[in-house]
Curated annotation (Swiss-Prot):
Protein's cellular compartments: Secreted
Protein's name according to its UniProt entry: Mannan-binding lectin serine protease 2
Domain annotation EGF-like: ranges: 138-181
Active site: H483 (charge relay system), D532 (charge relay system), S633 (charge relay system)
Domain Peptidase S1: 445-684
Organism: Homo sapiens (Human)
Amino acid sequence: MRLLTLLGLLCGSVATPLGPKWPEPVFGRLASPGFPGEYANDQERRWTLTAPPGYRLRLYFTHFDLELSHLCEYDFVKLSSGAKVLATLCGQESTDTERAPGKDTFYSLGSSLDITFRSDYSNEKPFTGFEAFYAAEDIDECQVAPGEAPTCDHHCHNHLGGFYCSCRAGYVLHRNKRTCSALCSGQVFTQRSGELSSPEYPRPYPKLSSCTYSISLEEGFSVILDFVESFDVETHPETLCPYDFLKIQTDREEHGPFCGKTLPHRIETKSNTVTITFVTDESGDHTGWKIHYTSTAQPCPYPMAPPNGHVSPVQAKYILKDSFSIFCETGYELLQGHLPLKSFTAVCQKDGSWDRPMPACSIVDCGPPDDLPSGRVEYITGPGVTTYKAVIQYSCEETFYTMKVNDGKYVCEADGFWTSSKGEKSLPVCEPVCGLSARTTGGRIYGGQKAKPGDFPWQVLILGGTTAAGALLYDNWVLTAAHAVYEQKHDASALDIRMGTLKRLSPHYTQAWSEAVFIHEGYTHDAGFDNDIALIKLNNKVVINSNITPICLPRKEAESFMRTDDIGTASGWGLTQRGFLARNLMYVDIPIVDHQKCTAAYEKPPYPRGSVTANMLCAGLESGGKDSCRGDSGGALVFLDSETERWFVGGIVSWGSMNCGEAGQYGVYTKVINYIPWIENIISDF
């Protein structure tokens, strides 16, 4: 609230030719005649003060000294606003029956204030009268006394000289500028059940509002209305709903109007569309109504679940648009005729029939199990039984294959897949047994011996640009020397790979073809033999038998079997002492040579490129005569693991003296244990 005097002073200091025109300030001083001297007898003076519309007058006294009389009958100051007397004042201090202004401030009820001063014909003492000051100030119309109706329905905003009203969201200001009417028309309900109510329910509903609600369901439904909780709409004892009313209209009939405090009865409309109209006038304080609506329709036949199945959801009845699904017990699947279904849901139609026939729940059949390469399958539950919970047992061909990872037991599960005890759906793997040989070693050193069938079943003959050797890994990889297949690294199909034979020129052998050649990335051709190792991937897996068996890769503990003077065995069809390629597979048992001793042997001429590295190991006799030679390149230097009783590849024939078996020189082999990560990565990636 601001004093108009202050506004007047402010407006006077700023030139605003285009701005709003403020009212002239209203303020001033009033005093009794002769003030500050004593006032005379038989005096009457009247002042009428007027403020602009929207303002009121404020008046207070700075001095007041009048004759005191009973009920201020003699001398007094009377304050009036319109027809109402605000106060009659006399004396200097208030008593039980008389009032003096003291420090009170007086306000006009409107924009005018009348002040009347009167003295009677005699005063026993001299009285000095009064001095008062007045000013116009803005009326805050938004403030109302307790018990009075608010100025605005929702929000009241005071401003100088007036006020205005505004409404909350969802309401609009009525043309009377005070009432907030609800925006409640055009609401459409399309769900099969729901609730609707008067605005603000259960608080008093707004005045001067017209609400329209529509329930619109699909044809075939019938709407049912239930009034719930409470019903309170303004009524009249003699006239039917003259003020506020509720009406319900369908395409068949009209219900209502409704008003009063009694809940209307249930209304079964027999219609799929309903319009509800609610109209209020400008008065009253009533809480309104609430309706819960439902719908019904012609029911469909009650669904009976098939054997080994159940219906969901279970309802007392199913009407239009209601649906149910069929779920089969674990181990059973939905079938419509002979066609499997991922799910089944039927919907009730408006004519009371289901849109789909009932399916069957048939036991899951996993079908005949897949054949296991290098293995067999046995039906445990019963001959040819492949239905839910049936058990089969896979096993690998004995001696030459062993099952990898799981135990081979598979069960037909509810998803229709044969599944292992570890949850695997893929077939088990029959992995070739490695390191089997018909030969045993007693540790004697001897050489140039012919191999017998089954002695070196991992031996591979590689024919390409030259004759070389290799060793079978698993059933589709060959380990060899990089220099032996370097020329064919981009033409793998040019390699002729033979295995399962002892005689180099025999027509009886197992043929294999190369799919890809992998040379170690650290190998540099014609620049020494460091990293002289390669892998050949075969087009197809070979069948493992007594004559074709893979060699084992070394375990971490394998170096304990490859110390100095430990015996390894090299085999191949390389040059013999007579200078010709051997017709029969030959082998030689040779000891491991101290690494420093071997390194020193190749530091002397004529071996400018003969550098022995940590990736190599040496074997042979200091006296010579026992060695691998040209044509043996890529073959395996193998050792017997006495703990597993399996043979493993410790070295790959790489290089040596220009004259094979030369005294003081040794055969140099790629140290396979240094390349286990490289070998495993290549095999797993390809």
